[in-house]
């Protein structure tokens, strides 16, 4: 089974089979990225636009590299240098992009639901590169790809801890929805004000402290405080205090399984949610995540382009 839809909006709507399709498809592109000539012409004659209404380093650059390695014509759109500053609506911006016969729009927007809104109103294919606190599907797919690459079997015997500002994290939501499709055992831990009020919808274990979250985990996914989404308004005394109770350090990682791996979607706040001795240590696969992001995004763009014919 492949993926036959026009857009990629979130992992909540994906089936287990569709997720596996993307993970398998990305293998070909990972091999290409490791070769001397990192390019093919699968998207020759296609146009992609990276429309980012929020700042981004890894995601925007990754999608740009992915499109160019597939041979597409790629344009980067920044809302701060566009007619958005003159009051143009998202709907009008998307329609104007589509009117230029754009094939794929990669959209990041501060409003939850923006990607679905845009996809329903444009003929171009839309990839959700993060919409508010809602979802970030390509990050979840690259996380699962990274888990498999490091020998983790995606089933009920896999213990994954997600720790940090879960309430404001679109990465956490996409990871959770994707991992639930495989029956993965999820443990969640966050400061009380950073745990979603409706956390029970995730049907996951809610941990009381870092030690419980780390104990016996195969995978630990650390999340930063989402300062730009109100995380700065949550009361905690200092970065040092946060690190003391909610940070991952070399002592806490010892509670996890010996072959446990540590993930982080970036950017890292070193000394806050993650100490440098862990971020740069043997358990960390953070840079591997970044590397795998290109392959996953190549698989996404190639699939949506093929679906368009």
UniProtKB/Swiss-Prot annotation:
It comes from the Bacteria. GO terms for biological process: 'de novo' pyrimidine nucleobase biosynthetic process; 'de novo' UMP biosynthetic process; amino acid metabolic process. Its EC number is 2.1.3.2. One of its GO terms (cellular component) is cytosol. Keywords: Pyrimidine biosynthesis, Transferase. The keyword Magnesium does not apply. L-aspartate binds at residues 86, 170, 224. Pathway: Pyrimidine metabolism; UMP biosynthesis via de novo pathway; (S)-dihydroorotate from bicarbonate: step 2/3. The keyword Transferase applies. GO terms for molecular function: amino acid binding; aspartate carbamoyltransferase activity. It holds the Pfam family OTCace_N. Carbamoyl phosphate binds at residues 58-59, 108, 136, 139, 266-267. InterPro entries: Asp/Orn_carbamoyltranf_P-bd, Asp/Orn_carbamoylTrfase, Asp/Orn_carbamoylTrfase_sf, Asp_carbamoyltransf, Asp_carbamoyltransf_Asp/Orn-bd. It catalyses: carbamoyl phosphate + L-aspartate = N-carbamoyl-L-aspartate + phosphate + H(+). PANTHER family: ASPARTATE CARBAMOYLTRANSFERASE, ORNITHINE CARBAMOYLTRANSFERASE, MITOCHONDRIAL. Catalyzes the condensation of carbamoyl phosphate and aspartate to form carbamoyl aspartate and inorganic phosphate, the committed step in the de novo pyrimidine nucleotide biosynthesis pathway. Heterododecamer (2C3:3R2) of six catalytic PyrB chains organized as two trimers (C3), and six regulatory PyrI chains organized as three dimers (R2). Belongs to the aspartate/ornithine carbamoyltransferase superfamily. ATCase family. This is Aspartate carbamoyltransferase catalytic subunit. It comes from Campylobacter concisus (strain 13826).
